[in-house]
Every structure is written in C-alpha cells, then in structure tokens.
C-alpha cells in the first residue's frame, strides 16, 4: 500500500466509552501490551499526517504517552464537533484527502485502509469499508419479536471513512447538528459514497466482551515471518552496474543471466524465503532463455505479489551491499525509493546501506559485489 503525500488520517478518541464498563475510557485501556489508542495510531504508520482528537482533560496524557508524528487536537462536545476541529486543523496544509477512523477500532488492517485509499485515488469523493448484513433481522417490543425486516442491501459500517478534505469539511460546516458518522453527513451533502471491503476483525470495542475477542484475534494474528537472501555477481567488462534498480556509472559491469542486480536479487530471495517459496531460480530458471537479460524488477514484483496473494504484507526490507566500489552512499536514497515503489511499501520501510570486507576476499579484490537482504512479512 502506497500512501499519497497529500493524504492524512484523523483518529477520533475524545469519547468516554461508558458502555465498555468501569475503568478508564476504552481508548486508554491496555490491549495485548499497548493501549487501544496506540494500536489504532500504529495502523496508520506511514501517513504523512495523523491527527488525534482527545478530550481536553486527556491532552496532557496524550502528550506524555503517544509517540510518533501525531498532532493532538482537543475534541468538542460531540464526535462531529471533534472531527470538525480536526478537519479545520488540516486546512491550508496541502492535504487533499482524509481518512477518519474510530480510535476504538484498533485492529483495522492495512488491506482495509488500502481499499479506501484505492477508491479515493480512482476518483471517488468518498469511500468507506462495510460488511453486508448476513443475520436475520427482527423488530421487537417488550422482549417479543413483532416483525422481521429484510437485510437486502444493508451493510454494517466500519472505518476509516475517506473523503476529499474540502468536501467533508463543507459537509460538517453545513450540518453542525452532527450525525452518527461522517458518511451520513456526506450523504446529506449529496456526496456519493463508494463501499469498499470491510473486515470482520475490524471490530469497534464497545462492550466489555469486545476486549476479550480482540485479545483472541491478536493472539491468532501475530504471524510474522523473516526471510534472508544472499547473492553474488562477478565483475565483467562494461561501463555501469545496476544496484537496487538504480543505474550507476562504473568502469565495470556485473555478469549475470539477467541484469545482474545483486541487491534486488538478494531482496527477492529474502521475500521468497519468508514465504517458504524457494528462490529466484525456482520461479525464473536461468535455463529459460526468456529471462536472458531480464530486468530484475520483474522478479521482485513477482515475489511481492506472491506475498500478498498468500495474505502477507511486507513490513520492512533491509539490503546491504558489500563492495569496495562503486560507492553506494550517494545513491542509497534513490535505491530505497525504487525498491519501495516495486514492492509497494512506504520508503521509510526500506533500508539500503553498504559495507566493505576490509579488502579481504573477492569483494576486497574488487572481483565482484555481494548482497545480503532481510525481509519482514506480517499476516495482513
């Protein structure tokens, strides 16, 4: 999931959550080692701006306990008042779109967030995740069923709900009386709202039993995989090398069946390794002439796509290049950016660095370049 630079997230956490039982407000309660609010904020890692609304009496606590690049805004008397204050804090900031999320939904996945972003990027002025109603619906009075109701066309709303900033801010200002959620205000303002896929695990913590369910989900969901990759290519005659997708002038080239991008090959194998899916040679055999001279981004894209097909998100990639020359440092930023584009993650989740072997071995004799890579995958 790539997050546009002009997108921001708003996380609402100014409510008191009295239905969740006695104790502190639910957003401050612990959930598997972190507060509910910390988990909700972490779900939006990589957003250029994250605005969190808090009750005025919680502002000092927010400053003390919430880490990361978040902006705190004092909430109002109602949820709508709080959201409007957060929206107004983004005016004139260059933000074009905003995703508004309930702070009491700490288990929202990158897949759900990505679905909203994709709809907005496709031109929808508003988009929100939801799940179709599958249970039978009844009407009841005094503890007795009085009628049934059709569930056709009914959905259970979730967050984050995404909007063009100007449009949703205008809707809030035009309807200060508020609404159940921001989609309701958007509909009143005449904005079409696209429904995107929701997730059963994206529950809103409302009742005491919801916390136990969330703990169970987290216990089942912590599927983290690490993969390592290693590759070596010898030097040959030439005037440039490809390293992590960047063409670097050099007095030699790297020898290989494809474009010999040693860094990209190591990262590709790291992803395959984390998935227990072999290596590049298994998926793109060097005996197959169609891969002669192929650009290595083809291999890396395939590995990233396979990860997503198997239900994993790439959380982090770390590549180390081992060589005396060429000097990698001046190009490391461009390399990390190129790799992030190929595997579909934020640039700050990719690291490219270099070291030497202190003139020892084949890299020390400048006979070639080696690379080591590590990839971290998390079940989405």
Swiss-Prot record:
- Pfam families xref list: IspD, YgbB
Q: Which CDD domains is this protein grouped with?
A: CDP-ME_synthetase (cd02516), MECDP_synthase (cd00554)
The UniProt annotation puts the region (2-C-methyl-D-erythritol 2,4-cyclodiphosphate synthase) at 225-380
The pathway where this protein functions is: Isoprenoid biosynthesis; isopentenyl diphosphate biosynthesis via DXP pathway; isopentenyl diphosphate from 1-deoxy-D-xylulose 5-phosphate: step 2/6; Isoprenoid biosynthesis; isopentenyl diphosphate biosynthesis via DXP pathway; isopentenyl diphosphate from 1-deoxy-D-xylulose 5-phosphate: step 4/6
Q: Which UniProt keywords apply?
A: Isoprene biosynthesis, Lyase, Metal-binding, Multifunctional enzyme, Nucleotidyltransferase, Transferase
What does it catalyze?
2-C-methyl-D-erythritol 4-phosphate + CTP + H(+) = 4-CDP-2-C-methyl-D-erythritol + diphosphate; 4-CDP-2-C-methyl-D-erythritol 2-phosphate = 2-C-methyl-D-erythritol 2,4-cyclic diphosphate + CMP
Name the segments for region: 2-C-methyl-D-erythritol 4-phosphate cytidylyltransferase. Answer: 1-224
Q: Where is this site: Positions MEP for the nucleophilic attack?
A: 151, 204
Provide the residue positions that the database annotates as binding a divalent metal cation.
231, 233, 265
Statement: the UniProt record of this protein carries the keyword NAD: no
Query: Which GO BP terms apply?
Result: isopentenyl diphosphate biosynthetic process, methylerythritol 4-phosphate pathway; terpenoid biosynthetic process
Residues bound to 4-CDP-2-C-methyl-D-erythritol 2-phosphate are 231-233, 257-258, 279-281, 355-358, 362, 365
Q: Which cofactor does it need?
A: a divalent metal cation
Where is the site described as Transition state stabilizer found in this chain?
19, 26, 257, 356
Q: Tell me its family.
A: In the N-terminal section; belongs to the IspD/TarI cytidylyltransferase family. IspD subfamily. In the C-terminal section; belongs to the IspF family.
Name of the molecule in the record = Bifunctional enzyme IspD/IspF
